[in-house]
Design a protein with these regions (language model features):
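Amphipathic alpha-helical interaction surfaces in cytosolic regulatory modules
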Residues: 22-89
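STAS-typified acidic loop motif
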Residues: 2-30, 47
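A composition-driven signal for long, intrinsically disordered, charge-rich low-complexity tracts
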Residues: 1-2, 64
Length: 89
């Protein structure tokens, strides 16, 4: 799995690639947590994700919950790939 962080003002973008599974989920959670600490808005770009399992979905839900617990924070999924959408739906 590849992970890239970009920060532009109050917006932190986490660009994920390839697979989000049991092995990579802790890293995804930590990156989301880091961006929530340093920015107001976190966007998780899933355009390049070809596979996600239940632990990957759980990491995204935990990110959303972390954002909700912090006043003024936002969490968004952007450019969700078809493969990820099939799992979410």
């Amino acid at each position: 799995m590849s992970i890239e962080q970009k920060i532009n003002g109050d917006v932190g973008t986490l660009i994920l690639g390839e697979e989000i599974d049991l092995d990579s989920s802790p890293t995804v959670r930590e990156n989301i947590k880091d961006l929530l600490t340093s920015t107001k808005i976190v966007e998780v770009n899933l355009a390049n994700v070809s596979y996600i399992d239940s632990s990957g979905i759980a990491s995204l839900i935990e990110g959303m919950q972390m954002a909700k617990q912090q006043t003024g924070k936002e969490f968004h999924l952007v450019d969700v790939s078809n493969e990820v959408m099939k799992v979410i739906e």
